């Protein structure tokens, strides 16, 4: 008999043009007094200030993500407004102080807008706080705001979605070979998000219409729900993400402009090759969208990619994937050559 299961998923989701104006309605349901709004450092700060103005009946502090004082626990609610970093820091604050979390994304470049988990690199920096898990109680996705984000970030969102087919294949492999717990429902949600990206790629690739963003946001929110049901990021993060994380760790010391979803798309092509999936189709979808499909286009050195492929498995030794105990340098280079990434 299976043990008792529990999971947390967002209970309020509002998306569409002008959705940000519904923020006071959402907050009123959460009965908050003091509110911390965490913003980015760029143009997205304007949206955080707009949220603060909409909540003028409350006591609101707007703080940039890199200036948040995690020792301060006097807020009743935390709202993350912006891209990955402010939303991740809002999750950290929510988790550390057990406060409800509202997410208001200004871009849709990855599934972090709806997931309970923070980026790998941030989780490594904050290990003293333990495992960071904070599911948003509400997501307010204003598609008119997200539509104004750089198209590169929106295309990266498709890249992140393409990776779900690999994450689920890795999960199934771990279930068969290692006896890992597997949720068919969570896996189905993740694969559905992949299919939405794959089948709509040509239609939405330019992101010139609100409905293009709506398709992307729905799929990314579906991924967040899948992770909430699974109780881990397993259905949405496999070997393709390990490769991306390995590259990101190596680029930390450089002034790289690499975008997470772009790296995931490259990792997806490589891991599809290793899994025996039709990697050419995935690469074609990436080309249609306008994602990098070679290491050169992504600004990544071939030796760095080889090194990432041989060490990525060690980033999460508890997560079995197609990488197994690691690729040899010869196998890694062959995979890059056969998929024409180099």
From Swiss-Prot:
Keyword Oxidoreductase on entry: yes
Cofactor: record remark: Binds 1 zinc ion per subunit.
Record InterPro entries: G1P_dehydrogenase_arc, G1PDH, Glycerol_DH
Cofactor entry: Zn(2+)
Catalytic activity reported: sn-glycerol 1-phosphate + NAD(+) = dihydroxyacetone phosphate + NADH + H(+); sn-glycerol 1-phosphate + NADP(+) = dihydroxyacetone phosphate + NADPH + H(+)
Binding site for NAD(+): 84-88, 106-109, 115
Function of the protein: Catalyzes the NAD(P)H-dependent reduction of dihydroxyacetonephosphate (DHAP or glycerone phosphate) to glycerol 1-phosphate (G1P). The G1P thus generated is used as the glycerophosphate backbone of phospholipids in the cellular membranes of Archaea.
Subunit description: Homodimer.
Protein name (Swiss-Prot/TrEMBL): Glycerol-1-phosphate dehydrogenase [NAD(P)+]
Organism: Pyrobaculum aerophilum (strain ATCC 51768 / DSM 7523 / JCM 9630 / CIP 104966 / NBRC 100827 / IM2)
Lineage: Archaea, Thermoproteota, Thermoprotei, Thermoproteales, Thermoproteaceae
